Amino acid sequence: ICDLLTELGGDASVGEIDGAFCDGRYNVNLNGRKMVGTAQRWRQSGGRPVGLVHGALLLENHREELIAAVNRFNQACGLEQRVRADSHIALHEAFAAPDAISRLDGLYRQMLAQVFAH
C-alpha cells in the first residue's frame, strides 16, 4: 500500500497519528494522516510464524460520520479519548479511485508471486 501511495505521488508512512481512532504503530498513513488501520495476530505453526493480518482502508470521505460514531462510543464507555476527522484521509480524497484500486491489485498480486516463489 505504501508503494502505491508513493508511486501516485503521496507521502506514505507507517506509524501512529495523533487523534486517530484505533491508533497504532502499523497505521498506513498518507500525507501525515491515517488512511489504513491494521490488525494482526501471530502464532507458531510447524516451527514457523504464521500471521493473520488485515487492514481497513478508508476509500471515501465519510470521516465526519465515522468520527462522530467513534466519539459517541468512547463517551458511552466512559473513555476520555476523542478522535478527530482531520487526523484521517480517504483514498478518494487524494487519488482517482479506479486507477488506485487497479494498481493496488497489481502490486498485491506481484507481492504474492514473490512470496510464493521463495
Regions found by a protein language model. Give the residues of each.
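Long, positively charged amphipathic alpha-helical accessory segments at protein N-termini or as interdomain linkers
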Residues: 4-11, 41, 45-118
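Beta-rich nucleic-acid/ligand-interaction surfaces
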Residues: 14-34, 43
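Beta-strand scaffold of nucleotide-dependent catalytic cores
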Residues: 37-39
